[in-house]
């Protein structure tokens, strides 16, 4: 990233949630690597491991850990393996979310109990679990925990449904963790990108219309890019972000400030 050369040199970061080279997590990983960070990655299952391996190798990483964030034993094993390789962790990127695709369309009223619980567990509660396990590797020197959210957490977004509720919980967890961990020099923040063409976003009904609507109406007339989100992550994980914690940073072309669409487009 221009202007970011070396700002993360000497820092080690764990990236959780890279699905492919269009993932927001990958945009963050690439930017952090270009800024000098040494990276480790997690994935879930053999198929995602095969996708991740060439990406990890391209940024010089040979640390890949298979983990299921709904399984305590799996989390324990992954972080134990990481501690065997590294004696410290400077930043952790949590880019993990899931909801049943069949419930990311239609009425929120029809959300099932099972999918509500599963969406909250994977998309929100998992941040607490990974922060707890990262804590021993950060407590002596401080660090950064970073997650990803979306405007649907605070405003009704078509078809986002239970994910909006899960992201609202995630953002609240960011604030509580920031308060809890701040005295030990550990910062906790979230980036809220606008809609992006990722594997996760493709599961949401009508998402192409959402892309067009955001690009047409955002003050900057643009959607977020991997480069923009990556650059923001580098700032938050670097010493330049040393006094920023508990924040939700919007990277959405300014769309979040709007009260209504551009009237010229109505």
Q: Which stretches of residues belong to each language-model region?
A:
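C-terminal helical subdomain
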Residues: 125, 183, 190-193, 209-244, ...
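A short hydrophobic alpha-helix cap/turn motif
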Residues: 33, 87, 138-140, 179-184, ...
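Hydrophobic structural elements of the Rossmann-like NAD(P)H-binding subdomain
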Residues: 15, 93, 146, 188-191, ...
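Canonical Rossmann dinucleotide-binding motif of NAD(H)/NADP(H)-dependent dehydrogenases/reductases
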Residues: 5-41
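Conserved glycine-rich Rossmann-like NAD(P)H-binding loop of the short-chain dehydrogenase/reductase
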Residues: 37-52
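A glycine/serine/threonine-rich, flexible loop-to-helix segment
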Residues: 53, 162, 183, 193-218, ...
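Conserved mid-core segment of classical short-chain dehydrogenase/reductases
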Residues: 65-76, 80-85, 94-117, 136, ...
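Catalytic loop of short-chain dehydrogenase/reductase
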Residues: 17-24, 97-128, 132, 139-183, ...
């Amino acid at each position: 990233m221009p202007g970011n050369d070396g700002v993360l040199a000497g820092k080690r970061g764990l990236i959780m949630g890279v699905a492919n080279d269009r993932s927001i997590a990958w945009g963050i990983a690439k930017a952090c690597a270009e800024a000098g960070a040494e990276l480790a990655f997690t994935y879930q299952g053999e198929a995602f491991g095969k996708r991740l391996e060439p990406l990890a190798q391209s940024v010089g990483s040979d640390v890949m850990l298979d983990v299921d964030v709904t399984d305590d034993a799996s989390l324990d094993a992954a972080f134990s393996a990481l501690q065997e390789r590294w004696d410290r962790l400077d930043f952790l990127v949590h880019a993990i979310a899931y909801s049943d695709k069949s419930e990311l369309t239609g009425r929120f009223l029809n959300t099932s109990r099972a999918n509500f619980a599963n969406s909250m567990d994977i998309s929100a509660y998992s941040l607490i679990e990974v922060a707890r396990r990262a804590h021993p590797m950060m407590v002596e020197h401080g660090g950064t925990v970073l997650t990803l959210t979306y405007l649907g957490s605070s405003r009704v977004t078509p078809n986002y449904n239970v994910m909006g509720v899960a992201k609202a919980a995630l953002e609240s967890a960011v604030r509580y963790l920031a308060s809890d961990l701040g005295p030990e020099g550990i910062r906790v923040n979230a980036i809220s990108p606008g809609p992006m063409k990722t594997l996760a976003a493709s599961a949401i009904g009508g998402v192409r219309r959402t892309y067009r609507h955001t690009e047409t109406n955002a003050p900057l007339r643009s959607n977020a890019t991997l480069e923009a989100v990556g650059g923001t992550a580098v700032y938050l994980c670097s010493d330049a972000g040393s006094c920023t914690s508990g924040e939700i940073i919007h990277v959405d072309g300014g769309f979040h400030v709007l009260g209504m669409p551009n009237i010229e487009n109505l």
